[in-house]
Amino acid sequence: MDKSKRHLAWWVVGLLAVAAIVAWWLLRPAGVPEGFAVSNGRIEATEVDIASKIAGRIDTILVKEGKFVREGEVLAKMDTRVLQEQRLEAIAQIKEAQSAVAAAQALLEQRQSETRAAQSLVNQRQAELDSVAKRHTRSRSLAQRGAISAQQLDDDRAAAESARAALESAKAQVSASKAAIEAARTNIIQAQTRVEAAQATERRIAADIDDSELKAPRDGRVQYRVAEPGEVLAAGGRVLNMVDLSDVYMTFFLPTEQAGTLKLGGEARLILDAAPDLRIPATISFVASVAQFTPKTVETSDERLKLMFRVKARIPPELLQQHLEYVKTGLPGVAWVRVNEELPWPDDLVVRLPQ
């Protein structure tokens, strides 16, 4: 290579070096103001699985992925034909048990009527016994004086004994009637228990039918469908996955020196890569109590400062409700926090929201 070509090559290398320095200078990250900290993060939200409470076949799914849903909105339905038949069977069992209760109550009334009749007979037999007993007493007195024959005395004695036997028989009938009453009451209790059991079964099946309509537990957005209509799921099988749009936050990491100064409820600003012109307000909702990752050895104070703590900055729910169409999980960005809360936010970090 001749001398002129070598000079040209050096000029090219020099120009490239100058260009690299200028590019680095122009594209270098802006310095972090004193009293502030910044860290990379990603938008996240609480995920909620929509699952079937009982085993069964998916009948229909009413929402598509990405759809915004409100709390209580029906998202999917399970096939309830078997449950409907089981409910009809339970209703029939209720009616049958109620009929048994009515029959047992009628039998109780009959036994009570029989007891009253038996008690009346006891009273009658008691009166008859009292009458013949008095006659027998008089007959003995008259027989001792020879006023009546021995045959008459024997007849009066036999009549008294017969009346006493009749009274005992009537009393036994009363006791039997009372036992029948207790048995009838037991039958009523058993029949009522069957009614309650059948009603409990019907309520449980009705609850299962109601739970077969899978509803949104809160406001949110459907992320993806885990299953499709026609699939058979076990109890607890997932059908949909959704995100709770009332709990959206950015997770990021800060070193010990900065994380230790943060307090829950402190202000933060979020800047998303997809919307670099916006400045989203947030509040510190979580600071880890232990470091999330550390160097292999921690011996010096400088190394201790390298310990990184996980932090969450939560976007206010009322702000989310105003801009639901912009909420997307997984978006990367940066989070700014104030290490010194007495400092005002710089002009570049003043809240700017979509119009």
From Swiss-Prot:
Keywords: Signal
UniProt xrefs under SUPFAM superfamilies: HlyD-like secretion proteins
GO BP terms, alphabetized: transmembrane transport
Any one cellular-component term (Gene Ontology): plasma membrane
Top-rank taxon: Bacteria
UniProt keyword Signal, yes or no: yes
A Pfam family it matches: CusB_dom_1
Chain positions covered by the region annotation Disordered: 128-155
Signal peptide: 1-19
Protein name: Uncharacterized protein YhiI
Gene, per the UniProt record: yhiI
